[in-house]
Curated annotation (Swiss-Prot):
Residues given in the record as phosphoenolpyruvate binding sites: T140, G156, S159
Substrates-to-products reaction catalysed: phosphoenolpyruvate + GTP + H(+) = enolpyruvoyl-2-diphospho-5'-guanosine + diphosphate
GO biological process, one term: F420-0 metabolic process
Gene3D superfamilies, sorted: Spore Coat Polysaccharide Biosynthesis Protein SpsA, Chain A
Organism field: Conexibacter woesei (strain DSM 14684 / CCUG 47730 / CIP 108061 / JCM 11494 / NBRC 100937 / ID131577)
Biological function: Guanylyltransferase that catalyzes the activation of phosphoenolpyruvate (PEP) as enolpyruvoyl-2-diphospho-5'-guanosine, via the condensation of PEP with GTP. It is involved in the biosynthesis of coenzyme F420, a hydride carrier cofactor.
EC number(s) stated in the UniProt entry for this protein: 2.7.7.105
Family statement drawn from the similarity comment of this UniProt entry: Belongs to the CofC family.
InterPro entries: CofC, Nucleotide-diphossugar_trans
Highest taxon, organism lineage: Bacteria
Zinc among keywords: no
Keyword Protease: no
Name of the protein in question: Phosphoenolpyruvate guanylyltransferase
């Protein structure tokens, strides 16, 4: 079994616009970069992941990917998460992947042990999908596909239920796996507050994001 992780990453410039009410453009960019590096760090430490593909149009993100032994793939069209993932799936198959794990670049609390448990769990079906919901149980923060092209991704509002329906239509065995370290992605001020609380409650993990938030707190206590 050869497992590739697929990681679509938006440009850092103008990133996390929904946080603009509380964070200026510079800190938002720094936060996006820090979270991305933490995700790459976790994936590099995950034994069950053989290769990581990063889909991005951001030159800086491409350079960082190379530094973490990931394969950067240019995403010049920037046509959205679904098309980026599909392009990643096609490239993964060309390189011999037998399954893919699609993740998000803004889930900095990713725990390699959680990912290895997910990937190493015995399954009776040869064709399956495992959906990891976001913390609200509505979106999709993780999508494990075997085979990689078993179904087309359909990210967006209420994607968890939609992915389940699409998998069933495709004849795939479906599993919903609630994994706290994968469930928290950061898009809104509430998400950022939840991340701060989670980081404060744990000693390890998300080193780059933790450092960035601590620096932000020192320079601007209101944030």
């Amino acid at each position: 079994m050869s497992t590739f992780a697929i990681l679509p990453v938006k440009r850092f410039e103008g990133a996390k616009g929904r946080l603009a009410g509380g964070l200026a453009a510079g800190p938002r960019r720094a936060l996006a970069e820090a979270m991305y590096v933490d995700v790459l760090t976790a994936l590099r430490r995950t034994q069950g992941v053989d290769r990581v593909l990063v889909l991005t149009a951001d030159p800086g993100a491409q350079r960082v990917a190379e530094g973490y032994d990931a394969i950067p793939l240019d995403d010049p069209a920037e046509a959205g998460q679904n098309r980026a993932v599909m392009r990643g799936v096609a490239h993964a198959r060309e390189l011999g992947a037998t399954r893919v794990l699609c993740l998000s670049g803004d889930t900095p609390m990713l725990d390699p042990a959680d990912l290895d448990a997910l990937l190493g769990r015995p399954r009776t079906a040869d064709r399956y999908v495992v959906i990891v919901p976001d913390r609200h149980g509505e979106g999709t923060n993780g999508l494990l596909l075997c085979p990689p092209d078993g179904m087309k991704p359909s990210y967006g509002v209420d994607s968890c239920a939609r992915h389940k329906a699409l998998a069933e239509e495709a004849g795939l065995a479906v599993e919903i796996a609630e994994i706290p370290s994968v469930a928290l992605d950061v898009d809104t001020p509430d998400d950022l507050d939840a991340l701060r609380e989670l980081i404060a409650s744990r000693r390890g993990g998300a080193a780059h994001t933790r450092g960035m938030l601590n620096q932000l707190l020192r320079t601007n206590p209101k944030n």
